[in-house]
Amino acid sequence: IYLVLALAVKKKTNARGATEINELVDVADFFNAHIRSELLCENATTSHPVVRADCLKLLTVFRGFVPRDAELQMLPHLAKLLLDSSNVVHSYAANCIEKMMTCRDYSQLQQQQQQLQQQNSTIAASAPVKFAPNDFAPFANDILQNCFNGFELQDSSENEFIAKLIAKTLRYIGGGGSNASGGGKLLANEVIFACCEKLCKRLDEAANNPRNPTYNHFLFEATTACVQCVDFSPNSQEKQRVESALFPTFLGILARDNAEFTPYVFQILALMLESAAVPAAGTGGVAVGISLTEQYLQLLPALLAPHTWDRQANIPALVRLLDAYLKAAPVQIAQLGYLTGVLGVFQKLISSKAHDHQGFYILNAFAKSLDLSVWSEHLPTIWQVLFQRLQSGKTPKFCRGFVVFLSVLVAKRGAEAAVSSMATVQAGIHEMILS
């Protein structure tokens, strides 16, 4: 196996495996003659784990050159290897399946390049995608079930390769991120709900004692894919089931103030709100307001508390979440008296050269989502803060943010409203700004 790996590979990348091979080595024939039988689970009692792991490594490296049908025939056996007692074998199996999902057919590309060279053509060719999500759909349930069972195997309670495969399967086959894969939704809702509940259990365990950042990251990637797999329209039962599974886990993480996990939680909460308040036809891309449930409302006081924003790593995720709140339910937030707290966050961010652009995100959300009559009383204070910063600490980044905010305000609320509000600070100041 090592001899073939050494002789056959001419070009290789970590992301794609072998992209060009030695024509004198018949990789497909070697796979069928020596590798395929080792990977069949019927040989589990006779095959040595080290040999099986090396066979999985070879298949992973040459996945772009092994015949497509041969790889598809191996999928159910690879899924069974996720339950192999050897940590190395089931980790290699998870990595192999994950890499195959986005594999490209480099054998076809190499043939095309040879033909182009013979024709003295300079046309660049690209490798076609080898598999479609439909090819993996019949095995998706087994893959996901065996992945979660694989966490119970020895030394694999936090196996990052298994966690990555779960996330990839939900995105690629389940439709969580179907824009990238072009696959659409090929998993039943009950499968997605079961995955969501199991992921919450894994997150609860990991939050008590975070040890493996890569494993934790892919758990949250998989959780995000679950959210993207289901219908999150306001009255959807799918939305309610996912929220009922996620909120206890998220609230527990926030209550423990887990520094590693809180940015992930804020981002997923923002995604949930953004998915529920999608732009409707005829609104010019403006999200349709929804009524926030008690689960979301009880988070707002903590989000607006000053100490929440003291941790630098939280700020990008918090800004996205606050922006999602303002776009999803601007009227409700204003009626509940939270605008003053939101403006307090804006003032904190705008005073920092590192985070002033985040403050402008919040201002732009104000201008886009809230009627001017709702927050016009706060505009003089906002202008004072901005003008003071322009005078004392102007930077190119701040100036760009200021111009964008002013443009959004004029486009949404009219030039007259913008000029008159600036005049409350100083008459004619808009002329000085423009000049």
Provide a role label for each language-model segment.
Residues 1-435:
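Karyopherin-beta/Importin-beta family HEAT-repeat alpha-solenoid scaffold
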